[in-house]
């Protein structure tokens, strides 16, 4: 047809090449009357144009006018003859395709269309064939184009007169079009087209009538820009398109052959297709354009007008489909075929998980494209993004897999891209925005000219920039070579091939040794395993095949594997490999040590708002990452949020996840969001009932919004402690979810407004209105996160840092053995895989594992080559640039070292970077991990290395130990330390890493370093601060002289305020997954791994100072100081050099006055009481190695005495030995212990928390004073990591949580106990913080029912709670102030929890644990270990016990024990207060016990009330009891006391309360920290008065907690006494000044003032410790009875506990409370003198005089808190008992005064 029409055209393209639209148009034109034929001029033009050639054909398709256009224009009635001519012309031009010549009149739209190479090539040709005739258009073109276009004149010739006619025709048609336009698209006001309708697309129906002037917004611009841009001649003028305005359009493009598209003749059609019409000419009324206007070829792209996005998309798609029906249909058909043939369901799953995930995504993208195409929603932008995502997935495939299956994925992606290529090109042409392109081009041109100094001409530059000069074939060849599987993926791997070989080794179950069960789930169990060759720890999830097959969920297992393998995000658990065995599908993932958030909530209740913010923000980032990849988790809940060793979050468990479509920004329009919210229509209701979204329950289809609903539930649970919807059955629960309103806590528990608002928006019933549905950005912008640095979350210090006892410590996890039993599945028959071929594809190995494994292999090879195994591989060797400070890697450990140096490097660097960000512990973690790797001794392999570390030291200044302030390096490791530990034993390593801050204390033996080996303490903070002002001088010289080993540099190291890890710590492999033993893929876990933390210990500590005793003197006096955690009342006992005799051995050795003692003989001393430290020193013989750090380097600040020191609770290190606890008890309590410890680490003070984190992660030796020091910046908590608070929290397990009121700020106390204390500390802190919005009265906030999970009987390590470790510790660590009482019953529940629990979980949690059972357990615990000590509410004790005056003796006794054993009163040992006889105390205690037992029943009913009312009292009472002198403290007390105390823990817990008003009489001026509260199990002397008994009881309860917390206390009370007696002289020598500070007991009885110590308090005090003597037990019982009092005392116990909680046995908590009564040091690290000081003056009680450099002491106010000091009130609260204050005052004598008096 066309042929006949274009009779002049020599070579018409075959009709079959034309689009239907073109053919139809041709037919129409045929049918038109002859007059419509193109005028002769037009025909001539066509003749001139010549045959179209192949290009023409190709273009034919592209340029074919849209059928719609033709239909509209083809109606003869509608179109005038001019229209006829125009049509004809267009058809003829279509045939000709005018490729050879560019008509000036060609429409730009046409030009835009062809994007093919032919188009580009045509662009290159700018030759114009002259058309014989010139029309107005031609003239116009000439004029407007100016001379910028190379051959404009030639183009003029081509212009034929017919155009004029076409103009008229156009104008007519224009008006017609307006009326008849069927185009669905809205008019485009911006259409730039001038009236040049002849060629202009202006007429296109798609645009409203071009006549409207509004359409010509560009007109003025057009007129002014007569010139085409200078680049006009460039073929690169775009994609051969013109800009809408003349200025913008390039002469080239307009004159290029591109413009001669088949539909060129019909400007109207083009106009219809183009978005912008040339604004250059405004049609006159007749529709004619003035000749001045140059006909612009218009872009076919839809106008970028203000039309709404959706309508614009629809319009463009209509145009597109009308114009290219075949292209669209073909694409849809091919897409459907592609999807059906390649669906993951239709092919065997890929063996490689990452590739399998990518496979899913490619298919999902194809589905989405098909959907959009059918819905008319496709845009070129969509194609761009689709292509980008496909390329991104391809890149991911290459990066994450070395499998041969990459080829399959590549092929898949190529197929899809080919399918969408042509439609994408066509749409690109249609939508091309010339103006936008022009501006971009102009900018590029300017940039090229100015910035790049381009020499070549701009056109060529642009062509090259556009990639038009490249040879695709050549590039393809290069790509194929690059992508070949032979190419090693790891650029940084030195032996690429070597690495690839091991990577081919498929993992199997035989490669791993199972260590223990971590947890059970519905489908299988998770085990802690260790890779046999690499020695790395992993978590192996074993899923029973039979279960999967029976449930037809094999595919789901593959989905989980794919997601875990593909995901690479610091907040998502990563998988290393997977394989199948006879019975199981196994997935080996990184091991995240800290347990899950559900267990944390269970143990401590609602979290502090700051902690919630961090956890939630990290989860939001994890979710954002997953959603961006189309992953819908579907099972978000606290159980699946794991806590890394650094305290950060990792999301896990993708067993129910679905893989949907990757996020596309083009999908953000309303319609798609709605579709996205119903992405899955499987009607499946899956997930955990409490977290299932309403749309899932209603089976309305669901999508990503379900995860945001679950996030809302999680946020509520974090803040409140329980889920918002409860039900006895899923149906009931679902009913509430769908219809019930959320109940918000009110009053004190009210949530912060922003938190409540965020929660309510996340819990919106309508998924479309739910926050997060649009994107995670919505959530991140919420005011709740104001001020949050989303990019630095990993750098933030976490408040809760798990304290691991060993590398194999899984105590933070609940095994759930009672619910699931998968262990038996091993015996099941083998699963026949005949029907499950796909299962065989399950085995895969991620690049992570390959790299690690290959690294290990290389390491081992290197090892073999190297002769000295110890240095087998040094990081320096691996990479000189590894400034991490790993000078050498221990050869032996290398095998289990992180793996390849690159991995190590990455880990370290990651930890360094991410941890740098989180300055605190992460670096420690890194170090710890590395520590295993590095041999400390090896570090200084050579002088250069040493020098390198040293060179940093100079910055440090004096102490080598100090970490370079700027650098993350914890500090150089002393050479000798390295020597001492040439190799780190795995065991030691595990221990140290496990110990975390507590580790040091816990395993003193472990941390025992050779003299020189003492870990150097480095405090980045300190460094930053005053840089050893004390250290300057010779000591500096001496220290610097020591060669320093490189230490792994970790930013976190710097973060550690005071990192005093012992080298032993360093070896702890406990490290996190990163630990050599554990592999953690992500920086977060890596960083968090505790082992890493220990590493810093290697180099961080400065070399110990070796002091050789001269005669009987060491020549220095040490003093115990109270270091409060921030503003809390929890303090930890630290020891400082109070005085150094000039010319004495200490002075000669370089010991400096005012330095903080971190280690004695390699054993951390923070948290130890004074007597224990003295004993350590005396035990060392003629020489002692003392590690010190300048106080300035710590975060400890000296401040005035605290008025409320009597409330202070000492955070104790738990001394508990693993053996004692036994695996089971440890499991049970370890979680709590950890939590408490961490909680303590969390110390309220942020700085403390950060320190703690680093410490805990770094050294986290539970008892390690060092740790506390390192934490000091954060809080002494580490040192005190002590359990007081932790204990408190532990005590309540939930108690802490349950009694937020016990906001033991110093969870530090909790830190006393390694784990529990941290939990406790956390709980108090959490409560405090939690309160913050509603925290104000944290004490009063009842723990959430969850939090309340019945607290195991306080100290009883009630097996019920595996987390009970906290509770176990509770007794020891709870400061009375904490009001552990609430913890006891967990009765403190948030007011909400007080309500009858709605949730089964609440009920479960609240299920009362019989008080008696708890007591029994607690008593056992107490007896068995200090850790487990009963916390008796002091108030109860007070009630039980008749008010008694606290005999000064008692108070003093506690302290005196500390001060020195056997020391005469004159020597500073407090004598028992005459006021009470031990017998009386015992009687009181027995009575108490009975009363407690009686009260137990009552308590169950009244517990909540009691908790709220008595909690404080009880806690105080407990404190008093706690204050009971410890044997160690009151050594002066008859040795018998000591012996008795010996029954209990050797040292009473050092809770100041437990210590009672021990006179800070330091035997030698060295104030021993308050003795551990733990007292011998045997009854102790009781203070004469019943109060004393009460106090004793409480102290016993509290003391036990303290004792527990003071796990590190090495000396039993008896031992302490003995040691004290034996070394009294030595002590005296040590602390010549009698004014040593008694660390914990602030109060000493007045008698103590007199200096007379009686044994009385000892016994009770001793009993106070974990080990409860029978009498103590009785006392504890009494304490329980007094629990009510305690509750009263302890605001922490809200009255509004849920009945359940009330029912909970508070006594156990009370004992814990008692422990809590042991006052937690406030976070501010202030030393307070012991009770003796308290005796001095009441106010002094508030703060023990902190021995300033000046030497004065602060009195420990805690005396009041000391049970002994307080009269009837065991409670520490001074205010409670008027007399108590006075007594406390008496007791509060400064140690010096006390000593003098004594």
Swiss-Prot record:
Family matches, as Pfam families: DUF1908 (PF08926), PDZ_6 (PF17820), Pkinase (PF00069)
Catalyzed reaction equations: L-seryl-[protein] + ATP = O-phospho-L-seryl-[protein] + ADP + H(+); L-threonyl-[protein] + ATP = O-phospho-L-threonyl-[protein] + ADP + H(+)
Annotated consequence of substituting residue 655 to A: In a breast mucinous carcinoma sample; somatic mutation
Domain Protein kinase: 512-785
GO biological process: cytoskeleton organization; intracellular signal transduction; protein phosphorylation; regulation of interleukin-12 production; spermatid differentiation
Enzyme class: transferase
Protein name: Microtubule-associated serine/threonine-protein kinase 2
Organism encoding this protein: Homo sapiens
């Amino acid at each position: 047809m066309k042929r006949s029409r274009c009779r002049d055209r020599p070579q018409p393209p075959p009709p079959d090449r034309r689009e239907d639209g073109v053919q139809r148009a041709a037919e129409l034109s045929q049918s038109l009357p002859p007059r419509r034929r193109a005028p002769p001029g037009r025909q001539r033009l066509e003749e001139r144009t010549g045959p179209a050639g192949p290009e023409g054909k190709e273009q034919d398709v592209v340029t074919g006018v849209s059928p719609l256009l033709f239909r509209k224009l083809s109606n003869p009635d509608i179109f005038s003859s001019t229209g006829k001519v125009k049509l004809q012309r267009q058809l003829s031009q279509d045939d000709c395709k005018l490729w050879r010549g560019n008509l000036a009149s060609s429409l730009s739209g046409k030009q835009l269309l062809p994007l093919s190479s032919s188009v580009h090539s045509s662009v290159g040709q700018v030759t114009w064939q002259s058309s014989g005739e010139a029309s107005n258009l031609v003239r116009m073109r000439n004029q407007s184009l100016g001379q910028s276009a190379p051959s404009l004149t030639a183009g003029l010739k081509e212009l034929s007169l017919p155009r004029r006619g076409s103009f008229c025709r156009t104008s007519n048609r224009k008006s017609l079009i307006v009326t008849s336009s069927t185009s669905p698209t809205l008019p485009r006001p911006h259409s730039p087209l001038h009236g040049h309708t002849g060629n202009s697309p202006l007429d296109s129906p798609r645009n409203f009538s071009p006549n409207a002037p509004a359409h010509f917004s560009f007109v003025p611009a057009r007129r002014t820009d007569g010139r085409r841009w200078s680049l006009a001649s460039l073929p690169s003028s775009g994609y051969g398109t013109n800009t809408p305005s003349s200025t913008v359009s390039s002469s080239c493009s307009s004159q290029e052959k591109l413009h001669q598209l088949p539909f060129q003749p019909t400007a109207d059609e083009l106009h219809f297709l183009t978005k912008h019409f040339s604004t250059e000419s405004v049609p006159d009324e007749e529709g004619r354009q003035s000749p001045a206007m140059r006909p612009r070829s218009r872009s076919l792209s839809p106008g970028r007008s203000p039309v709404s996005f959706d309508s614009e998309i629809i319009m463009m798609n209509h145009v597109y489909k009308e114009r290219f029906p075949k292209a669209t249909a073909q694409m849809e058909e091919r897409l459907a075929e592609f999807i059906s043939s390649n669906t993951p369901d239709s092919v065997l799953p890929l063996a490689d998980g990452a590739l399998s995930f990518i496979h899913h995504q490619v298919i999902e993208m194809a589905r989405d494209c098909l959907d959009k195409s059918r819905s008319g929603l496709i845009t070129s932008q969509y194609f761009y993004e689709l292509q980008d995502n496909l390329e991104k997935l391809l890149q991911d495939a290459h990066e994450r897999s070395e499998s041969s299956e990459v080829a399959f994925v590549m092929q898949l992606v190529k197929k899809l891209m080919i399918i969408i290529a042509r439609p994408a090109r066509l749409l690109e042409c249609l939508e091309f925005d010339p103006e936008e392109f022009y501006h971009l081009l102009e900018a590029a041109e300017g940039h090229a000219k100015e910035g790049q100094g381009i020499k070549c001409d701009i056109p060529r530059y642009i062509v090259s920039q556009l990639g038009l000069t490249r040879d695709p074939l050549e590039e393809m060849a290069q790509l194929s070579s690059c992508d070949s599987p032979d190419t090693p993926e790891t650029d940084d791997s030195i032996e690429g091939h070597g690495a690839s070989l091991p990577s081919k080794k498929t993992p199997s179950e035989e490669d791993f040794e199972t260590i223990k069960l971590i947890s059970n789930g519905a489908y299988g169990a998770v085990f802690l395993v260790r890779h046999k060759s690499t020695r790395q720890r992993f978590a192996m999830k074993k899923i029973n095949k039979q279960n999967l097959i029976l449930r037809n969920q094999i595919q789901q297992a593959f989905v989980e594997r794919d997601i875990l393998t593909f995901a690479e995000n610091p907040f998502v658990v990563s998988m290393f490999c997977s394989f199948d065995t006879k019975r199981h599908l196994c997935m080996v993932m990184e091991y995240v040590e800290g347990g899950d958030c559900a267990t944390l909530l269970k143990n401590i209740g609602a979290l502090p708002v700051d902690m919630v913010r961090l956890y939630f923000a990290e989860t939001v980032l994890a979710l954002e990452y997953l959603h961006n990849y189309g992953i819908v988790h579907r099972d978000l809940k606290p159980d699946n949020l794991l806590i890394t060793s650094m305290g950060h979050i990792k999301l896990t468990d993708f067993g129910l996840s679905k893989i949907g479509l990757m996020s596309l920004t083009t999908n953000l329009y309303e319609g798609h969001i709605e579709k996205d919210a119903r992405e899955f229509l499987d009607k499946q209701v899956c997930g955990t009932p409490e977290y299932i979204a309403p749309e899932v329950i209603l089976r309305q289809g669901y999508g990503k919004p379900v995860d945001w609903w679950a996030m809302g539930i999680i946020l509520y649970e974090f803040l409140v402690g329980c889920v918002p919807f409860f039900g006895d059955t899923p149906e009931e629960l679902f009913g509430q979810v769908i219809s019930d309103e959320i109940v918000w806590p009110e009053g004190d528990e009210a949530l912060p407004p922003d938190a409540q608002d965020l929660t309510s928006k996340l819990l919106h019933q309508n998924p479309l209105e739910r926050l997060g549905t649009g994107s995670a950005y919505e959530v991140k912008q919420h005011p709740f996160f104001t001020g949050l640095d989303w990019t630095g979350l990993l750098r933030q210090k976490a408040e809760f840092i798990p304290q691991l006892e060993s590398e194999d410590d899984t105590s933070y996890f609940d095994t759930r053995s009672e619910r699931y039993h998968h262990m038996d599945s091993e015996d099941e028959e083998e699963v026949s895989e005949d029907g499950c071929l796909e299962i065989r594809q399950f085995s895969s190995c991620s690049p992570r594992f390959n790299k690690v494994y290959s690294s290990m292999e290389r390491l081992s090879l290197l090892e073999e080559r190297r002769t000295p195994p110890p240095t087998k591989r040094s990081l320096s060797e691996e990479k000189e640039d590894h400034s991490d400070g790993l000078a050498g890697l221990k050869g032996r450990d290398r095998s289990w070292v992180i793996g390849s140096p690159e991995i190590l490097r990455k880990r370290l660097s990651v930890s360094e970077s991410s941890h740098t960000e989180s300055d605190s512990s992460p670096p420690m973690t890194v170090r710890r991990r590395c520590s295993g790797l590095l041999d400390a001794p090896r570090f200084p392999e050579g002088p250069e290395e040493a020098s390198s570390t040293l060179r940093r030291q100079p910055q440090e200044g004096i102490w080598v130990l100090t970490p370079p302030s700027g650098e993350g390096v914890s500090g150089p490791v002393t050479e000798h330390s390295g020597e001492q530990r040439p190799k780190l034993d795995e065991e030691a390593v595990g221990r140290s890493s496990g110990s975390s801050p507590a580790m040091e204390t816990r395993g003193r033996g472990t941390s025992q370093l050779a003299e020189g080996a003492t870990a150097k303490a480095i405090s980045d903070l300190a460094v930053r601060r005053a840089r050893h002002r004390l250290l300057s001088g010779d000591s500096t010289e001496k220290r610097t002289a020591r060669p320093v080993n490189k230490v792994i540099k970790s930013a976190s190291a710097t973060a550690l305020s005071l990192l005093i890890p012992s080298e032993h710590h360093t070896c702890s492999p406990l490290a996190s997954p990163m630990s050599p033993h554990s592999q953690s893929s992500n920086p977060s876990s890596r960083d968090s791994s505790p082992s890493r933390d220990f590493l810093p210990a290697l180099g961080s500590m400065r070399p110990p100072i070796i002091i050789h005793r001269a005669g009987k003197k060491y020549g220095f006096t040490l003093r115990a100081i109270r270091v409060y955690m921030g503003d809390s009342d929890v303090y930890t006992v630290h020891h400082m050099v109070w005085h150094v005799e000039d010319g004495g051995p200490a002075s000669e050795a370089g010991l400096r006055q005012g330095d903080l003692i971190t280690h004695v003989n390699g054993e951390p001393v923070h948290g130890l009481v004074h007597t224990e430290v003295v004993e350590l020193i005396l035990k060392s013989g003629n020489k002692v190695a003392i590690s010190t750090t300048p106080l300035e380097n710590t975060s400890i600040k000296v401040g005035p005495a605290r008025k409320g020191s009597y409330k202070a609770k000492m955070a104790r290190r738990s001394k508990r030995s693993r053996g004692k606890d036994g695996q089971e008890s440890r499991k049970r309590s370890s979680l709590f212990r950890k939590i408490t410890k961490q909680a303590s680490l969390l110390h309220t003070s942020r700085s403390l928390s950060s320190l703690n984190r680093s410490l805990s992660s770094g050294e986290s030796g539970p008892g390690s004073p060092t740790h506390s020091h390192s934490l000091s910046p954060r809080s002494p908590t580490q040192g005190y990591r002590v359990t007081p608070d932790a204990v408190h929290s532990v005590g309540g397990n939930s108690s802490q949580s349950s009694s937020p009121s016990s906001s033991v700020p110093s969870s530090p106390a909790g830190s006393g106990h390694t784990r529990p204390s941290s939990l406790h500390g956390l709980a108090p802190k959490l409560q405090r913080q939690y309160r913050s919005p509603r925290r104000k009265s944290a004490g009063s906030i009842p723990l959430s029912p969850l939090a309340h999970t019945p607290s195991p009987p306080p100290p009883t390590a009630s097996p019920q709670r595996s987390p009970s470790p906290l509770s176990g510790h509770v007794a020891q660590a709870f400061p009375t102030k904490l009001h552990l009482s609430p913890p006891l019953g967990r009765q403190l529940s948030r007011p909400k929890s007080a309500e009858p629990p709605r949730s089964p979980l609440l009920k479960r949690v609240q299920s009362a644990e019989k008080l008696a059972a708890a007591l029994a357990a607690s008593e056992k615990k107490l007896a068995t270990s200090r850790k487990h000590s009963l916390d008796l509410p002091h108030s109860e004790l007070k009630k039980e016990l008749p008010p008694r005056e606290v005999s000064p003796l008692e108070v003093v006794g506690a302290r005196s024990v500390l001060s020195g054993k056997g020391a005469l009163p004159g020597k500073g040992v407090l004598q028992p207060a005459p006021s009470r006889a031990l017998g009386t105390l015992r009687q009181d205690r027995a009575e108490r016990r009975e009363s407690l037992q009686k009260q137990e029943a009552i308590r169950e009913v009244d517990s909540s009330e009691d908790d709220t009312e008595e909690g404080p009292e009880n806690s105080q009472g407990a404190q008093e009891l706690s204050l009971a002198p410890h044997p160690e403290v009151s050594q002066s007390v008859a040795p018998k006391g000591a012996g008795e105390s010996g029954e209990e823990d050797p040292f009473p817990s050092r809770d100041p309360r437990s210590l009672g008003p021990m006179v800070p009489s330091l035997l030698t001026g060295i104030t021993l920290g308050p003795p551990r509260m733990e007292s011998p199990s045997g009854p102790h002397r009781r203070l004469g008065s019943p109060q004393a008994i009460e106090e004793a009881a409480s102290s016993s309860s509290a003391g036990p907690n303290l004792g527990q917390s003071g796990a590190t206390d090495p000396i039993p009370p008896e031992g302490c006494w003995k040691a004290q007696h034996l070394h009294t002289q030595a002590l005296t020598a040590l602390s010549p000044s009698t004014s040593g500070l008694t660390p914990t007991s602030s109060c000493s009885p007045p008698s103590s003032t007199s200096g007379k110590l009686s044994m009385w308090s000892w016994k009770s005090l001793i009993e106070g410790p974990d080990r409860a003597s029978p009498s103590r037990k009785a006392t504890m019982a009494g304490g329980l009875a007094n629990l009510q009092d305690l509750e009263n005392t302890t605001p922490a116990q809200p009255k509004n506990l849920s009945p359940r909680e009330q029912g909970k046995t508070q006594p156990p908590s009370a004992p814990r409370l008692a422990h809590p009564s042991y006052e937690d040091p406030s976070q501010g690290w202030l030393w307070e003198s012991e009770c003796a000081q308290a005796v001095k003056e009441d106010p002094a009680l508030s703060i023990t005089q902190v021995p300033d450099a000046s030497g004065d002491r602060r009195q420990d106010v805690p005396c009041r808190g000391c049970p002994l000091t307080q009269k009837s009130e065991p409670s520490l609260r001074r205010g409670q008992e008027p007399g108590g204050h006075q007594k406390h005052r008496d007791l509060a004598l400064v140690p010096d005064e006390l000593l003098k008096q004594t």
